[in-house]
Amino acid sequence: MYRTSTLASKTTSTSGIAFVSPYSIPASNHTKLLSLLSHLESPSNERSESLHLNVNVPVPVQFDASEIIDLNNTKILTQSAELQSHGKNKLPSNQLKDTVNVNDEPELYLDIKTIQPTNLQEQLCIVVLNNFPNLKNIAVEKVLLHLIELGLEDRIEGQQDGKEIKDKARKFAWSLVNYEFIDLKTIFIRFNHVKDVKWFVKTFHDIDAILPKVELIYSAQIDEYLKDLEVLPSVSVTDRLKNQIKLILYNSKNLAKPKIKGFEDLDRAMQSYSDYMVDNNDLIDVPNNMKDSIIREIIRFRTKMLSIEKENRQKQIEIEREKTKQKLNKLFEGIKEASDAQQEQQREQEQEQEQEQEQGQKQKEKFATARTNNQAAETFVMPEEHEELDDKEYDAYVKAQRIAKQNKDYNQRLNAFKAKEEAERTRLELEIKRLQDYEVNVWDNKAATIAKFRNYESNGLANLYEMNYNEYLKQRVAKRTLEEELDRADIEKETQELENEVQPIKHTLDTYESKHAEPEAKRAKFNADQNEADIEVPMSPLEKDKRVIIVKELSLAKQNQIKTKIDDLVEDCLGVKDELLLDVIFQSLESSNFDGRDALVTELEEFLDEDAVKLVDLLYDFVRSLA
């Protein structure tokens, strides 16, 4: 009559279509189903037809229908004969409990700080449910109530004095740790009585059979301290409880907002392909015998593409999560190191205090023994100002000295500890600030690096002349100023060296002239007469042109005269002085002397037009005249 397999059956064809039964019911539930059917009223006028419950639905191979099948099974199994026994218009109490508004606030929820244990009893009364599903708080409390109140309803219905049993109901409070990047929660349950804790641990030691992947954590001292405590016998977990909890878990209204984002839209799209229809108007040009195969190929292709995109997004999210985890680990390691150093310092202080106390105790015993044996004068030398003190006064004096020393040491160590604490706090605050600004700094550094790399070639002097003339002038002026300062320093240094070298020579010449003044005077007169007799032959212009002139080898004074001449010629042509043209012309003259005349004229024609040739000729004539 009904399918008895616990898993959905699939029959996959060669075309990529699988046939899935929409529900599956274990054979153990046949009796429940028959009991439900026995309460149904069979109308006599309606024609009876056999129900074809063995139905297979075609779905794509890539589509996972296990969740839908599980939900259908849960809805079927949670039906009870109470629906008929309480009447058509009256719902049972447990169903009314399940219809609580999900927007209500939980009544038993406490802040995590208030649930922290302060003694051994409270520690034993706390159990933890790890990897709890991501439900809203009211749904979490509803699940906990179903678990903890297991068996109480049957006891209340089975006995007349239900009020007394309700008063003895298991009382508890709960809290949770809500992680920032993980959907699963950690639930803390604090019972009011230790016997309830033992009952809960004994009943739900395999809680993962009810709540998948949930781990029950409790104190290991429960077995030691509560082994003699008698509790109510544990109740076996019924299918009804499992189905009630499944209904809560599978109800989308009970789910909290997920923290893992990035591919929910793809999940919805893949789920929508279960009822995806291709419009036949889009396939009007396709032969009828090929339409079914093409529709299957379209659905399979879209599903495959969505699966690939979902995997890629999931990989990206995992990479980002791993980076965040590494940052947090680095931060926690720094905090742990600081905490370990602080604990080590506290242990050292405690050891030193214990040693001081032991030494004080030994010294006190030594003095007491010496006074008892009337040998205090031999074993201890009393300070002169305290020789007249009796035993009580001396003990008070020693105690005051010890306390003063301890206070002094304490203040010194306290100040040192505060200094270290402040330095460590500052370092951690800077580290936190750096981590908070990590994303912003990464983008800023990337932009700065890209801009620097992009402008690397354009920032050279060779390109600044054409691309950014003002910047070129600034750099040239700065460079020229630096060169002039270096030249002045070199001139002063050379002048000082020459003066130091000439001073002894001048002294020698003065001595020599004082001895040979008359012969030198006659010789000077003879040379003057001889020079007047000589006739100077001027050099022809052709001979001057044939001379090889090297500008770099000219003296600094002549080079300055050339620069002044260039400046005057540029001012005559343009009307204003131009430092750029001065540097360009002088550099060309230094590098090529008179060989680069044509290249210099071509370069100056951009600024001076026809005056470029005239300026170059006048400049060359001036340089020849200096040589």
UniProtKB/Swiss-Prot annotation:
Residues 337-368 are annotated as: Disordered. GO terms for molecular function: RNA binding. Residues 337-350, 359-368 have a biased composition (Basic and acidic residues). Its main location: cytoplasm. Residues 300-442, 469-513 form a coiled coil. It is found in: Cytoplasm; Nucleus. InterPro entries: PWI_dom (IPR002483). GO terms for biological process: mRNA processing; RNA splicing. Keywords: Coiled coil, Cytoplasm, mRNA processing, mRNA splicing, Nucleus, Ribonucleoprotein, RNA-binding, Spliceosome. One of its GO terms (cellular component) is spliceosomal complex. It holds the Pfam family PWI. It comes from the Eukaryota. Belongs to the SNU71 family. Component of the U1 snRNP particle, a subcomplex of the spliceosome. Component of the U1 snRNP particle, which recognizes and binds the 5'-splice site of pre-mRNA. Together with other non-snRNP factors, U1 snRNP forms the spliceosomal commitment complex, that targets pre-mRNA to the splicing pathway. This is U1 small nuclear ribonucleoprotein component SNU71. It comes from Lodderomyces elongisporus (strain ATCC 11503 / CBS 2605 / JCM 1781 / NBRC 1676 / NRRL YB-4239) (Yeast). The lineage of its organism: Eukaryota, Fungi, Dikarya, Ascomycota, Saccharomycotina.
